[in-house]
Amino acid sequence: MKLINICIFIFAIICIESTFGFYTDNSNVINLTKKNFQQQVLNSQQNWMVEFYAPWCGHCKSLKPEYEKVSNNLKGLVKIGAINCDEEKELCGQYQIQGFPTLKFFSTNPKTGKKGQPEDYQGARSASEIAKFSLAKLPSNHIQKVSQDNINKFLTGTSDAKALLFTDKPKTTDLYKALSVDFFKTLTLGEARNLNKETLEKFNIDKFPTLLVFTNDDGETFTKFDGKLTHSTIYKFLEPFSKKSNNDNNNNNNNNNNEESTKTTTTEKDPASEKFIEIKDEKSFEKSCSTGLCIVALFDQSSIDDKELNEKYLELLNTVSQNFIGRMKFVWVDVSVHDKIVPQFDLSGTPNIFVINNSKKRYTPFMGSFSDESLNSFFKSVLSGLKKAIPFTDSPKFNSQQKKQKDEL
C-alpha cells in the first residue's frame, strides 16, 4: 500500500510538471508551441536559443536553473525559448529530437534577415557557456563603421533617419549588436571612433558612449539619447525613427521580453529627463535644454482657478512624457512671471507647448488640443522629423526677478 501511494505521488508530480511545464509565465524563458513557433522564432529578426525538453527528464531538471539564469542575463540580447516535447511531439519530431535536453540555436542570416537551419549546441550545460555561445552569434556587419573620412557621407547620404554611436571602445558591444538585429533594414546604425576634436565639438560629444539619431540628410539635425543604457530603454528611443514605425503607425514588434535584466550603470541625468520641472531662470533652462529636444510647456499661474486647471494639464503631460524618456527633456514655465516667451516665439496664449532645439536654434509649436492622443502624435511627429521646425535667434528670455504682485484688498 505504501509503495502504491509513493507511485501515485510521483505520477501526480509528473502530471503537474507536464501540464504547467518547467517555465512559468513569469519566467524569461519563453514557452514555445506549434501555434507560436513560426511567428516567434522563424519569422522574427532575433536570434533564439531553444531547449527541447521533457518534464520528467533528470538532465532537463538539472539544466533548468542554469537555463533560467541564461534567460535573465541575455534578456533583450538573445531570445531564450523552450519546447515541452511531451506536449509538442510533432514540433520536436520536425527537428528530429532524439534525446533530452537538446539545445538548438536559431540564428538570422545577416544578409537575408531570415532564419536558416538551426545549429546544435554541443557545449557545456552551464549558464556562462550557453551565454558565451549565444552572444558570439550576434552579427556585427549590420553596423556601419564611421570614421573621420566617411562621417559626412554617412550623415548626408540618405534622407532616412540613422543612429550613430560615438564610442571609444575598440569593439562593438553585444548590446549594440543586438539592437542592430532588432532594427535590421528598418533603421541604419553606425558606430564612430577616432573622430577629431572639431567634429566631436560640433555634435556636443563630451563623453563616451553618446548616441545620436540624425533625422534627415542635413547632417546637423539630431536627437540625443539621455536615458539608461539598457536594451529596453534604447530600443524605445530608437523605435519611432525606424521605417517600420513610420509605416505601421508605431507598431512595436518588440514589446514582450525586451527589457534587459542585468544591472547597468546609468548616465548622469537632469531631473527634466524624467518629468516636467519648473524653469525659473536662464541658467536652469540652459542646464536642462542646452542640447537635444526639449518640450516647453507654458502656464499662467496668476490665479487659483488657472493653477487648478494647469495642475491637470501638467499631470497629463507627465503621463505622456513617460513615452519619451531618453528622447526629450521636459520643462514648464510660469508665463505670468516670465512674460517675454509667448511673444518671443509668436505663440497664441496659454496653456501652450512648443518643442525647442536650443543648440540648433529651431522650435516647433504645438497646434492641437491637450489630449493624450494629440500630444503623443505631436511628439512622435517631431522626433520623426515630420513636423517643420521654425528658426529663431535668441534663447528664451526670462525676467531677472519675479514681477511684483498687484496690490490686493
UniProtKB/Swiss-Prot annotation:
Which compartment or compartments is the protein found in? Endoplasmic reticulum lumen
Its GO biological process annotations read: response to endoplasmic reticulum stress
Write down any Gene Ontology CC term.
Answer: endoplasmic reticulum lumen
Q: What GO annotations for molecular function exist for this entry?
A: protein disulfide isomerase activity; protein-disulfide reductase activity
Q: What is its main location?
A: endoplasmic reticulum
EC numbers, comma separated: 5.3.4.1
**Segments of skewed composition (Basic and acidic residues):** 260-273
Q: Which residues form the signal peptide?
A: 1-21
Which PANTHER family has this protein been placed in? Answer: PROTEIN DISULFIDE-ISOMERASE A6 (PTHR45815:SF3)
**Family (UniProt):** Belongs to the protein disulfide isomerase family.
**Official protein name in the record:** Putative protein disulfide-isomerase DDB_G0275025
Per the UniProt entry, what species is this protein from, by scientific name?
Dictyostelium discoideum (Social amoeba)
Q: What is the lineage of its organism?
A: Eukaryota, Amoebozoa, Evosea, Eumycetozoa, Dictyostelia
